[in-house]
């Protein structure tokens, strides 16, 4: 019996096909349990969740996936938890919140990625959020560190972003362009 081998492409050991695009190159993951923490700041603060990756290609795309928790001090608060991702010292939030905007304009001057409501009357309950963002502009093969930043939108609110035992995580995936 004669054998026949037919393939559309051969993927090298580096994980990316020659002239291929969209292939997963690598994944990095971090998860943390922080002690109890909160803020009243209306300026973005680094909340301690970060992950680093060294892209193999300067043209690749980095998909950032985040899962986190938040809640406010009081059930009657009507504030927003505002979140964004920094790549090293660059805020990747452009203020275009799409359907997550707080008004009908779909834009914001807040340089953020996500706004999460206090959800009055359950603002003091533990609220979880997750979101994904694709960084298409890193243009680097040096190590990149992505960090989650959060803040209150209004003064007078106390935003809790960590509690003992709660797991938060960030995943970075590099895809070939």
Where are these regions (language model features)?
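Extended, low-complexity regulatory regions
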Residues: 49-51
């Amino acid at each position: 019996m004669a054998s026949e081998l037919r393939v559309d492409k051969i993927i090298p050991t580096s994980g990316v096909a020659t002239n291929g695009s969209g292939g997963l190159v690598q994944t990095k993951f971090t998860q943390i349990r922080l002690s109890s923490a909160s803020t009243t700041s209306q300026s973005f603060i680094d909340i301690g969740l970060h992950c680093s990756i060294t892209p193999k290609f300067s043209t690749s795309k980095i998909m950032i996936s985040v899962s986190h928790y938040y809640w406010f001090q009081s059930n009657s608060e009507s504030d927003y938890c505002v979140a964004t991702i920094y790549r090293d010292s660059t805020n990747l939030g452009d203020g275009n919140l799409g359907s997550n905007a707080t008004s009908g304009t779909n834009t914001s001057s807040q340089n953020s990625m996500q706004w999460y409501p206090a959800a009055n009357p359950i603002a003091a309950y533990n609220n979880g959020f997750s979101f994904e963002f694709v960084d298409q502009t890193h243009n680097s093969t040096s190590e990149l560190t992505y960090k989650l930043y959060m803040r209150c939108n209004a003064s007078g609110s106390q935003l809790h972003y960590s509690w003992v035992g709660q797991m938060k995580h960030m995943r970075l995936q590099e895809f070939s362009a």
